[in-house]
């Protein structure tokens, strides 16, 4: 038995554990901790900061900030996006604002120089278009998938950041209407998004989806085995 077959056999023997997110409970001075999951093929683990809930028509129901314990999320990835470092390279379903928000260019703080701003706008456009195209192709391959079609219908409205600002999830500068880079007010009044993101900025918020499809499947798209 070579080592590659041994890895395959071990994976198959533990298939019942694939995709399960379990936690080891707190005990004494030890805090609750995540047990590293056995990932499905072409999947990765990411910390999602915001959950957006839609109905099956792709209409926004609500959005919420994920507390630290509920952030770990198993997401599908492509061969390219699983190891992305720079440039536009979208995940297929759950991703950062740069990819899922069609109104990203309206709200991302602009680069100072004209040349950098031009490059920034090009990257933002390519990021969203790549995400939309991948999701569209997936939905075309699986036309009966209510969740995919709902997410696709919503992101095509290109109002995601606008909706999150209006819902009090994200915050914009009063003077520029671009995303507030840091919270400068009283720390006791710090909005949840800044507390969750820590040293990171709002542009780096990672989005996951719930769809109330009313078909008996879990609304959490990231917990649906069919996805």
What spans do the regions from the language model cover?
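Conserved phosphate-interacting/catalytic interface
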Residues: 1-227
